[in-house]
Amino acid sequence: GHRNPQGLEIINKKIFSTEHGPKGGDELNLIIKNGNYGWPIASYGTKYENLSSASYELNHLNNGFIEPLYQFTPSVAISDLVKCTNQLIDYYGRDGCLLATSLRDQSLIIFLLSENLDRVIGIEKIDFGQRLRHIAKKYNGETFSEPDGSIFISSDQGNVIKVYFNLIKD
């Protein structure tokens, strides 16, 4: 199962999700039809102190569950998930590019995925010093961006932040 889903995005007919784990173990998942993602048996998070049962199984596969593509321990409180803008896709040279916001880590996270979209091959974080909640989308679900590639992110402090990516290749 899933514990606390936060964001969903589709790339090339594949569905990706972010979810909060318990005291760590936040996940990026590739959703597979009829797949079981382990909750409440398997998690990379830690049980809360008021629960007397043993810790979670760390390995999802040993129990027939699907492993996350990526997990964060300690927790970053991952939130929204969107496909990268065309400018970022061109810059990184791949369709498999996702943006996620984080509340606790207060950063924008860029996930780079393999060509098959079945594993994370790179991750970048940009710190904002604010709890980031949502990335603006168009009515059709595409990530909203201005002609220069900038995006807009809302924070829990009530701010709307315009993010411009200075995409200069070495």
Where are these regions (language model features)?
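A generic structural signal for well-ordered alpha-helical surface patches
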Residues: 106, 130-133, 158
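Conserved beta-strand positions that form and line the central face of beta-propeller blades
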Residues: 125
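Structural signature of WD-repeat beta-propellers
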Residues: 103, 155-156
